[in-house]
Structure formats: C-alpha cells, structure tokens
A protein has these predicted regions:
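Long, charged N-terminal accessory/stalk domains
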Residues: 1-354, 382, 389-392, 396
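Conserved, carboxylate-rich catalytic/transport cores that coordinate ions
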Residues: 1-2, 9-17, 21-28, 293-635
Length: 635
C-alpha cells in the first residue's frame, strides 16, 4: 500500500474525483486542519453538497420502500441484477425520470402519513363522543341563566344521591344519564346560573369529573356524523393514493438505478468532505495499492495536479488500510478472514495458506457426492444468474469450491445421499445388492478416519508454527524462532519416537531446550519454576488442539449415519415413490444442518487452532471510493 498526496486545481476537483472513483483504487483520508493551514487559507469544504447527496439517497430509498409496500415485486430468494451500460446509467434523462417518480411517490407517502394521523385523531374523537350520542344538547353548553356540564361519576353514585343534591339546591339542578359502562356513569347536568359554583362543588364531592368538548358545536350525534363522513373521505383518498403509488410500479427499475447512482454520488461527497483547500486549490491524502500507482498517474494526466506517493512508515502501520490480494481459488476465503479480523498491515495474508485446509476439511465433514453436486449446481446457477457481489459473491464461490471437495470425499466414502442408491435398488429389484465403490467406510473404518483427522490437524498446526518461524526469522528474532517453534518440534518428535519404542533421548533434549529457552532469552532463573508450568500447559494445549480435529471424523460420521437412517425409514413402506419423497425430505434436512454446521466447525478450526499459531490481527479494511452498486450490474 502507498500513501498518496495530491494537490489539484479547485476548478477540476469534481472531474478529478470522478476519475478516481472510476479507478476504484483510492481511499481518501481525513486531513486535520492546523492553525498554520487555516492562516494559509486552507479549510474543510462546507457540508451542503454532502447533505444534499444524503437527502437524495434517502429519497430514493424511501420511494423504493413505498413501492415494495404498495406494489410488491414478485421475487425469490435472490434478485437478478440487470446489466446496464455506464452511458445509460449516468444519463441525465434517466436521472430526471427517476427524480420525478421519487418526488411523486414520496409526496403521496407523506400524505398517507397525514391521513393516518387524521384518522387516528378522528377515531379518538368518535370514541369520546360515543357515550353522549343519546343527548340532544349542544356540546358547547349554554350561556346566561343556564349552565350545562358534561361529566362522569362512579357507579357507586346512586340516583338518590343525585336527587339529594338537586333538592339541596332548591330544585335549580337537574341531571340526565346519557350512558354507562363497567366503571362510569355519563351524566348531563343542567343548573341555574345562580347556583353554578355550589353545584360544581357538590358534584366534585360526589367524584364528578368534567368532560370538555373544546372546539365542538352542535350535538354529539351531529359531530359524530361529521367525523364519520370525514373518515370516509380520508379512506377514499387513502385508497386513491395507494392505487396511484401502485401504478408507478413500472418505475421500479429506474428508481433502483437512481438509488445506486445516489449511493455512488454520496460516496464521492463523503470523500470530498475529507479534503482541504482554498478557492484555488485543494489537497487530498489517502492510500492506494502499490500496483495501481502507474495506472492512477496515467488516468490523472489530463488534470493539472501534483502527485506524491511513498511507502508508509512503521509508525503509520496501524493507520494503513489492508487489502487482501488473492486469486480465484483463495479470494472466496476473504469472507472468513474478514469475519475473524483482517491481518495487521505488514504481516502475512493467511488466505493462500488457509484455503487448502478449509476446503479439504469441509469436504471431509460433508463427504457425500449428492450433497457436493447440490452445492456445485447452486453455486454455478446463482453466480451466473444473479451475479452476486461482495460477501455474497464470495459465499457462493466458496460454496462451489467446498462442493467439489465434498463430492471428491463422497466418492472416496461411497456416499450419494447416504446409501440412497443401495436402498433404491433393493426396493426396485429385491435381492439385488448394489453399492458404490469406496476407498473406506465411515462406519467400518472409524479408527483410520480418527487417526487421519488428527494427522491432518497436526499438519495444519505444524504449518502454522512454520509460518511463525519464518516471520520471526524475517524480523531477525532467531532465538525466539528457535526456542518457541523448533524446540517444540523436537519435543513432538521425541514423543513420537517414545511412542514407537525408540527411546526417550530426543524427548529429553527437547524438554531441556524448553527449560533452557527462558534463560538464554534473558528471562532469568526466577522464571524457571514457571517454565515447568509452561511446559505442561504447552504440551496439553497442543494435544487439545490436535484433539479438536477429531470433529472432522465426528461430522463425517454424523452426516453419514443420519442420511442412512432417513433412507432406512424411507425404505420401510417398500414403495419407490414413497421412498424417494421421504428420503429426499430427510436428506434435505440433513443437508441443511450439515451445510451450516460444517462451516461453523471449519471456521472454528481455522480461527482457534490455526490462526493463533502465527496470525496478527487488527488490520483496517481498505475502503476505496468505488462505483459499487446494489441493484444493477454496470457494464
């Protein structure tokens, strides 16, 4: 990776950034504006253009969400990416059509929100009026000599209590019950104006709570009718708007393209916000892969600019982004590495070393020709038809590679959806014995598979240690390399020789070197007692790591047994059609579980058993300004 610094003309800034974005190889970094720079006139650009780009991107996403709601598209698990030429994609006509459609849809969507708010408010008002529909008295009350109150009391307030209240006011108060529910009585109370205050005080003593109909005139029934008519009008308008939005479903492709265009423009504006400049020039800093320097310089020849590239210093390593550079075989493993953590800049890319182990181990655990065929077919169809990119593309490429390994291991174990063919032939032709040729059987050769699994684990662990040895030698840490890797290899060889009855001399030498290591490395005699504990922990740790690889045998055995059990159950009815249906259902379940289970266990072996021998994580992902699209495929 190279550090890039570029000084260009402000008048060419937009065109230059577009040229860089076409190259898709430059990550633009933020520049801290110092006091000296401010005095020289350098400053960050205003954020108006960035906010405008964010708003445009948000508008298209909102419009698409509305279309998905009111004009849903028939689609399967994956959406096919339409191929679009760059000229058509960036044409002004396409942008104008999409912008008009988005504005119309979003305006109607906002109105739908207003309608929903009004509907909720009106329904709440109708619920408030419902207890008073039998009262033929204006809700606004009365003026002058007559006072009118609408309110509620508890069910414990009896008619006798209300009559006593009226009598205490010399008959100048009367009341009417409008309705009641489980807890309240809804009362209309009328009294002479001269006793209004006394009446209210007495009513409060009974627990009377006033109900206000602010802004309403006329009776409850009249207001309820008006609200019902308004709700009907709102419902009609809502249906018309939804139909209008649904009628714009044909604009979906234009909106999808526009959403991708807006995302590209937004990335460019975000990069622009990291620049500094004056009204005449601008300054850009960032990172680009070393093998793209010449191509970038050629692409920027038409512009008036000065370019400087240099190697990063060691102090800059934590800030240098990391781009994994792999071929078609190892590129799908990027998703595994990125899921764990990118390697620190200046360290080793693990993908080429991990790829053969990951693919082989997955095949060992699945080990079925039928499952392998399904994986390869799914990978080819989805990759060709839907052309997924990014992590999705890597996932289906990895699926195909693991499918090849699964098929090969299935051929070695004679598995095709378990023993599907054996059971099928037995049903079609009773008495006929048929079996696919195989090198070994997961059920009969358990010991061999167990030893083979641990042997493969030992190979991968030693590979990890060898990588660590080479890296330490590159950094001239020869003592660390000898005492932390080579001495342990001597111990392993000694254990193997002892197990074969060849004596313990090599093991004693290895243990002595392990004990000697801290002293030679300058860790002192005081650490000697801790060395014995370290020796024990390392031996048991390595043994535990190797035992972890027995999961290769366990997953192979489990998948094979489950498939055979389903085939056995399917064969019980003795009918070919029933056998095929039941067997395929059972194998589909087994395939789905193993597809995920084998990935998880394979991932664990790489991250915990292999990476911890040499891997240095903490890398920062390389995020260049790109033309990446979500919905269309630029051609």
């Amino acid at each position: 990776m190279k550090h890039l610094r570029l000084l260009g003309m402000e008048s060419e800034r937009e065109a230059l950034l577009k040229a860089m974005q076409d190259m898709e190889c430059v990550e633009i970094s933020s520049i801290d504006v110092s006091e000296e720079a401010l005095k020289s006139g350098f400053a960050k650009p205003d954020d108006k253009a960035l906010m405008s780009a964010q708003e445009a991107s948000r508008a298209y996403r909102t419009a698409l969400a509305s279309l998905d709601r009111f004009a849903p598209e028939k689609k399967g698990m994956f959406r096919k990416r339409q191929g679009v030429s760059r000229a058509a994609f960036f044409s002004a006509e396409s942008e104008e059509n999409a912008r008009t459609a988005a504005e119309t849809i979003n305006k109607d969507t906002r109105r739908l929100g207003e309608i929903e708010s009004e509907r909720t408010k009106n329904e709440a008002l109708r619920a408030t009026l419902a207890p008073w529909l039998t009262v033929d008295v204006p809700l606004g009350g009365a003026d002058g000599a007559l006072s009118v109150f609408f309110g509620t009391v508890g069910l414990n307030v009896t008619d006798d209590a209300l009559k006593a209240l009226a009598d205490s006011l010399d008959g100048l108060l009367t009341w009417q019950q409008a309705s009641s529910d489980r807890s309240l009585r809804y009362l209309l109370v009328m009294c002479h104006g001269s006793v209004k205050e006394r009446a209210l005080s007495a009513l409060r003593d009974l627990g009377f709570s006033t109900v206000s109909f602010r802004g309403m005139t006329g009776t409850a029934k009249e207001n309820d009718k008006a609200l019902a008519e308004n709700l009907a009008a709102l419902e009609k308008e809502r249906q018309e708007i939804e139909q209008r939005i649904a009628g714009l479903g044909g604009k979906r492709e234009a909106l999808l393209e526009a959403s991708d265009r807006a995302a590209i423009a937004l990335r460019r504006e975000e990069a622009k916000s990291r620049l500094v400049g004056t009204d005449k020039v601008f300054l850009l800093e960032g990172w680009l892969p070393a093998d793209h320097c010449a191509a970038l310089e050629k692409a920027l020849e038409p512009f008036t600019c000065a370019i400087e590239t240099r190697e990063p210093t060691e102090d800059e390593y934590p800030q240098v982004p990391v781009q994994l550079k792999n071929n078609k075989l190892t590129r799908p493993l990027n998703m595994v590495t990125e899921m764990y953590s990118l390697p620190a800049y200046g360290t080793l890319d693990p993908n080429p070393l991990m790829a053969p182990f990951f693919i082989l181990f997955y095949g060992i655990m699945m080990a079925d020709m039928g499952y392998g065929l399904l994986m390869m077919i799914a990978s080819v169809i989805i990759s060709k038809k839907y052309r997924p990119k990014g992590t999705s593309g890597e996932l289906f490429s990895l699926l195909g590679l693991c499918g090849i390994s699964t098929f090969i291991m299935g051929a070695l174990t004679g598995g095709f959806f378990g023993d599907f063919l054996t059971q099928l032939v037995a049903i079609v032709s009773p008495g006929t014995v048929f079996a696919l040729p195989k090198l070994f059987d997961p059920l009969d050769d358990l010991t061999m598979i167990l030893i083979g699994s641990m042997a493969l684990g030992l190979v991968q662990i030693i590979t990890g240690m060898a990588i660590s040895l080479i890296e330490k030698c590159k950094r001239k840490k020869f003592l660390d390399a000898f005492f932390e890797e080579i001495t342990w290899w001597i111990v392993f060889i000694g254990i193997a020789l002892l197990a074969l009855g060849k004596g313990a001399a090599v093991l004693y030498v290895g243990c002595a070197l392990v004990l000697l290591g801290p002293i030679v490395q300058g860790k002192g005699w005081g650490k000697l007692t801790g060395v014995f504990g370290s020796l024990y922990n390392h031996v048991t740790g390595y043994f535990g790591d190797i035992l972890s690889y027995t999961r290769l045998m366990a997953l192979m055995l489990a998948g094979s047994v489950i498939a055979q059990v389903f085939n056995m159950l399917a064969a019980m009815p003795g009918n070919v059609i029933a056998f095929i249906i039941i067997s395929m259902l059972g194998n589909a379940m087994n395939f789905g579980l193993n597809l995920l289970g084998c990935y998880v266990h394979d991932l664990r072996l790489q991250c915990l058993e292999f990476f911890n021998k040499f891997y240095v994580d903490g890398g920062k992902p390389f995020r260049p300004m790109t033309l990446d699209t979500e919905y269309v495929d630029l051609q």
